[in-house]
Regions:
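Nucleotide/phosphate-binding catalytic cleft detector across ATP-hydrolyzing
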Residues: 1-112
Length: 112
């Protein structure tokens, strides 16, 4: 069996990396997301969100949604990954794209 992946994603506790076949590493950003406390909308992701950490206003909350290499906040992780894939210009055609997502070897079935 030959594995052909169009996209590889490494959701790390500190950084998230996205690689695309034929393009190489297209995104390396801190695994952080800033959310509007009132609406829940994404205010910033990656470096922009990480820069807000410790400087949050009452309106914005910065979340690092991965802990010990696994997803601790599913909703925030999903929103962050969607934003990263948009930034990497992968928002179109993902239904037909093979993907490899890295997970720690010690992750439980639920964490995977």
């Amino acid at each position: 069996m030959r594995l052909r992946a169009g996209v590889a994603v490494d959701l790390g506790t500190v950084n998230t990396l996205v690689c695309v076949a034929g393009r190489g590493l297209v995104l390396e950003e801190p695994s952080a997301i800033a959310l509007d406390r009132d609406t829940g909308r994404v205010a910033a992701v990656g470096r922009a969100a990480d820069a807000l950490a410790g400087k949050e206003t009452q309106d914005v909350e910065v979340i690092h949604p991965l802990r010990d290499g696994v997803i601790a906040d599913l909703d925030a992780s999903t929103a962050m990954l969607q934003a990263f894939l948009r930034r990497a210009r992968l928002h179109r055609g993902l239904l037909r794209t093979s993907a490899v997502v890295c997970v720690p070897s010690g992750a439980t079935w639920v964490e995977r």
